[in-house]
A protein has these predicted regions:
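Charge-lined substrate channels and their catalytic hotspots, especially those that engage the 3′ end
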Residues: 2-126, 135-181, 212-222, 227-244, ...
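Catalytic-core elements of nucleic-acid end-processing and repair enzymes
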Residues: 131
Length: 273
């Protein structure tokens, strides 16, 4: 596996900006950049206290790639919405649409790339973890692959995301949107009452998420609020919770650390402060 070389911003000649002022930028030629250009801060302008101004400043100062090349966008636009019968016959996928899956993420999550399901069995619980099959769309050395390698990751700013892949993939075909058939890779296994895993298999699949849930909803359900979840998914979520407790118990017995690390949250007022 080859990783893209890290990009380093040279800030040796960084100037000083007075308070309440924001630097603007212009493009200048640079032989080592991918497209022959780089952004360079050259002057300051009165600060407009709003989200757009702050995020444009962050994008410019960090040299983040905020636009996709035309050929990358064209490659993403070629993919059509999924036709389940075609996906099952052409790509030899296992049909898991009847197996109730849910996604569980934070309230502010902007992409949903994994879904889970579980059911009680004699030996314990059978669980399914399904992730979006990005490799189906992003082939090695393709324009999409090269752009993803160049970017390395999606960048999450407080109220927006600079995605690693173009929107037709990042926010649609590779996002496990409730009620939409999606190409996935599934890891299926049995977890016994001691938290041991067995009968593990990984295979290409087709799922259809039943609900987009949040950690807050699930925690409220665990705390006894029966109205926290849609009734249609409550039984499956209960099985997911019980299976996860078995896995967690075994991890702790093996010496795993359980760290409660607070996550920063950026809150803006209406003026963008």
């Amino acid at each position: 596996m080859r990783l893209a070389k890290p990009r380093v911003n040279n800030r040796k000649n960084r100037g000083t900006i007075k308070s309440n002022r924001s630097p603007s930028s212009k493009r200048s030629r640079h032989p080592r950049s991918r497209n022959g250009h780089r952004k360079k801060s050259v002057q300051s302008s009165s600060s407009r206290r709003n989200d757009r101004n702050h995020f444009e400043l962050a994008i410019n100062s960090l040299g983040l790639p905020d636009q996709f090349p035309k050929k990358t966008i064209a490659a993403a636009d070629r993919f059509k919405e999924i036709i389940p019968d075609d996906a099952l016959t052409q790509f030899e996928r296992r049909d898991l649409r009847s197996r109730l899956h849910v996604t569980i993420d934070g309230e502010d999550a902007k992409d949903f790339d994994d879904a889970v399901s579980a059911c009680k069995e004699k030996a314990g619980y059978r669980i399914w973890i399904s992730i979006a099959d990005v490799a189906h769309y992003v082939k090695a050395s393709s324009p999409l692959d090269k752009e993803a390698a160049f970017r390395g990751t999606s960048v999450y700013l407080p109220t927006c995301v600079i995605p690693m892949l173009p929107e037709p993939l990042a926010n649609n075909l590779c996002s496990l949107i409730p009620g939409q058939p999606r190409l996935t890779l599934t890891c299926e296994m049995i977890v016994d009452t001691n938290g041991n895993r067995s009968h593990i298999s990984i295979y290409p699949s087709l799922i259809q998420s039943a609900a987009r849930l949040t950690y807050t909803q699930v925690q409220s359900h665990m705390d006894g609020n029966q109205a926290a979840l849609p009734e249609s998914v409550a039984d499956t979520v209960n099985d997911i919770i019980l299976a996860s407790k078995l896995l967690r118990q075994q991890r702790l017995q093996k010496g795993s650390l359980d760290l409660e690390v607070p996550e920063p949250e950026v809150i803006f007022d209406k003026a963008g402060n």
